[in-house]
Amino acid sequence: MSKEIKAQVVVLGSGPAGYSAAFRCADLGLETVLVERYSTLGGVCLNVGCIPSKALLHVSKVIEEAKAMADHGVVFGEPQTDINKIRIWKEKVVNQLTGGLSGMAKMRNVTVVNGYGKFTGPNSILVEGEGESTVVNFDNAIVAAGSRPIKLPFIPHEDPRIWDSTDALELKEVPEKLLIMGGGIIGLEMGTVYHSLGSKVEVVEMFDQVIPAADKDIVKVYTKRIKDKFKLMLETKVTAVEAKEDGIYVSMEGKKAPAEAERYDAVLVAIGRVPNGKLIDGEKAGLEIDERGFINVDKQMRTNVPHIFAIGDIVGQPMLAHKGVHEGHVAAEVISGKKHYFDPKVIPSIAYTEPEVAWVGKTEKEAKAEGIKYEVATFPWAASGRAIASDCSDGMTKLIFDKETHRVIGGAIVGTNGGELLGEIGLAIEMGCDAEDIALTIHAHPTLHESVGLAAEVFEGSITDLPNKKAVKKK
């Protein structure tokens, strides 16, 4: 059975980028069709990414905090974990959000077509669903087809003990010994969860630090905290993976490589993602797609085909939901006739580990590479009353300032709820604030948030909560 429909705008993919674009198009009065290959809206982020991982990380945090309270006179019994109930909780969270999206689509009169969509021409997409196909003829299209985990040819990915991030989030079992390939955000978040649930976690990373995009001083605080939780094998890479009846055997080479192949009960491959650009038959619409699968766009998210736009993971790094949402808004606004552009000064990045590692704007390594003259100011949480009282005093807040203008150009926070504290720094960079603007803003006390203001005071030389290196010297 097949049918044919017409729309002013068709959006291919319903992840955060796609549904945001579709809903904004509808709000701007455009007849909109949203194509999604799965039965629920929300894409990777809501279904098998950002949201379920945060639900599991919440469970992990409660377990670890309960254990830590023993040092403060409150002793709980050994936690009894029921992974079936944890899984049900995670799915409840996901269902609440995906159900909310379906409701908002109906409220906005967005037509949702389920099935695998591919271009058949510059103004048509064929959607193959279960039992029926739909041809969507469109005036404008927005490609938001996302990305998928990278698979390496020497790894037997068909073995159920070799996981990608989706498999890890299913929480089918808690392996006794888990290897995580890749010391990036996804791998470390999953390592945090499985360690709390009882797995012995090992992480192999080819670079000399985990979370390679972040500055070393920030990551150092994180690695110091987890040294007794994870075994880190830095400057080491996997060379072979063999699936045997009694486990997965992994051979490695490098600085921390074991001499012999190590046996693991499960291996999580978390070495990045690849865009889905080559899976949508874009060439039939005249789209230019590079060899990796990325679609090139301009600042209005327009492809080489003027009436086709692309947003989200499929247009390039960083592959982050919040970046895709803003790109989706821009594409919708442009299609409606507005002169909007995607030109952010900053895009925040956060590892929702414990402690969290969050940064925004320029890192030190980026500032150095660009030849920017800069100065760093840090405020250690060891001097924060709230951090000490909350038993998280190993954190740090860092600001990076342009040495000539004193404007803040970057910042990072490592510590409990660091991602929640990052917003002020991002806004300060977008608004062109200098150190004085931040330092003279009264921050509530005692809070972790005030560490941002105190770091600015360190730069300004007005700090009174630490020894002041810029104090006027008495003659």
Curated annotation (Swiss-Prot):
Pfam families reported in the protein's UniProt record: Pyr_redox_2, Pyr_redox_dim
UniProt cofactor note? Binds 1 FAD per subunit.
Cofactor requirement: FAD
Query: MF terms per GO, please?
Result: dihydrolipoyl dehydrogenase (NADH) activity; flavin adenine dinucleotide binding
**Would I find Acetylation among this entry's keywords?**
no
- Please name every pair of cysteines joined by a disulfide bond in this record: 45-50
Provide the active-site residues from the annotation.
445
InterPro entries of this UniProt entry? Class-I_Pyr_Nuc-Dis_Oxidored, FAD/NAD-bd_sf, FAD/NAD-binding_dom, FAD/NAD-linked_Rdtase_dimer_sf, Lipoamide_DH, Pyr_nuc-diS_OxRdtase, Pyr_nucl-diS_OxRdtase_dimer, Pyr_OxRdtase_I_AS
| One GO process term, biological-process aspect | 2-oxoglutarate metabolic process
Which residues of the sequence carry a binding annotation for FAD? 36-45, 54, 117, 313, 321
Q: Which N-terminal stretch is annotated as signal sequence?
A: none
Instruction: Spell out the PROSITE patterns in the cross-references.
Output: PYRIDINE_REDOX_1
Q: What class of enzyme is it?
A: oxidoreductase
Protein name (Swiss-Prot/TrEMBL): Dihydrolipoyl dehydrogenase
Q: Which organism is it from?
A: Vibrio parahaemolyticus serotype O3:K6 (strain RIMD 2210633)
Gene this protein is translated from: lpd
